[in-house]
Swiss-Prot record:
Signal peptide: 1-15
Protein name: Hemagglutinin
Source superkingdom: Viruses
GO cellular component: a single term: membrane
Summary of subunit composition and partner proteins: Homotrimer of disulfide-linked HA1-HA2.
Record organism: Influenza A virus (strain A/RI/5-/1957 H2N2)
Gene3D superfamilies: 3.90.209.20, Hemagglutinin Chain A, Domain 2 (2.10.77.10)
Length: 108
């Protein structure tokens, strides 16, 4: 029975690890990573979503903050067009459009 517990414990511990690495190819561009400086870019994948199906998930029952036509900078720096966001009591993550209309500049 103790062996089963040890195997389950080892499996749980290994499942909590995050591995950061890179692949080899013939690129010459250098970047700084979390772990190293001046690393040759060897494999890149854009992990930002470019399309959306219209559904946003709640995290732990808390909905996201949908900025609509506001940018994060406009919201934080006080663009009056973004004032409606000030009354949101809590949010789990922020959803910003790619090119929001109301950024740092506003009419007036």
């Amino acid at each position: 029975m103790a062996i089963i517990y040890l195997i389950l414990l080892f499996t749980a511990v290994r499942g909590d690890q995050i591995c950061i690495g890179y692949h080899a190819n013939n690129s010459t561009e250098k970047v700084d990573t979390i772990l190293e400086r001046n690393v040759t870019v060897t494999h890149a994948k854009d992990i930002l979503e470019k399309t959306h199906n219209g559904k946003l998930c709640k995290l732990n029952g808390i909905p996201p903050l949908e900025l609509g036509d506001c940018s994060i900078a406009g919201w934080l720096l006080g663009n009056p067009e973004c004032d409606r966001l000030l009354s949101v009591p809590e949010w789990s993550y922020i959803m910003e459009k790619e090119n929001p209309r109301d950024g740092l500049c506003y009419p007036g």
